[in-house]
Amino acid sequence: ISECDAGIFDAMNKGIKLARGTWINFMNAGDFFSDTSILERMKEYLIKSKADIVYGSCYRYHPFYSYVKVPGNLDLLKKGMEIPHQASFIRGAVQKKHLFSLRYRLAGDHDLFLRLYLQGYSFEYVPVLVCIFSLEGVSNTRLLEAYKETYLVLTKNKVADLKSMNSKLKYVRGYVGCLCEMMLPTNLKWKLKAMKKELADKTKTNRRY
């Protein structure tokens, strides 16, 4: 279908309502499956799975900084977006019951996954590199808006309380961090991100030994 909508999540909701398949996956402009055999490979897992949401890893791409994101502990959803919707497959019956909230322009997918997690729906990780995800999308270029919406998601779902001083301080620190990041030249910003991740990976490796 091609028609006016109230944003990306409104358009995705329209697709959900029309979908007739057992599983639903959304791949946005600029993102794509990691190779042409992914759907066949995922089919093997989806047929056997008893979970409500099945997800894999994704390759996050930027000209200055690229890496494979393997989702961690689901409790991290209480802090931010941990599972890219491009790498996830949600049962159609579940997705139709829980549409994306139109309250958000950027963080609607985070809100959906957090709601499903808090309501006890089952998640299953599978060792498949599902998609290639562009880091030049709106959630990475509109940092302040994305950050504000993340905190709205957390407060709405009652995993953060901006009335507490501790939460307020965390929010302010994060907000200032976004402002500083926006002032950096693009290539420097992504090079610093790459260095930070490399250091974090080395720290994890050292802890194992």
Which residues fall in each region the model found?
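Acidic donor-diphosphate engagement hotspot in glycosyltransferases and nucleotidyltransferases
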Residues: M12, D35-R41, K50, G108, ...
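A short, conserved beta-strand element in the Rossmann-like catalytic core
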Residues: G7, F32-F33, Y59-Y61, R105, ...
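Conserved nucleotide-sugar donor-binding catalytic segment
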Residues: G56, S66-E149, V153
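Short aromatic/hydrophobic "clamp" motif used to bind/position activated sugar donors
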Residues: I24
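Membrane-proximal basic amphipathic "stem/tether" segments
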Residues: K158-Y209
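Active-site acidic Asp-centered loop
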Residues: E3, M27-A29, A107
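Glycine-rich, basic loop-to-helix element that forms the pyrophosphate-binding segment
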Residues: S2-A19
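Conserved donor NDP-sugar-binding/catalytic core segment of glycosyltransferases
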Residues: F32, T36-Y67
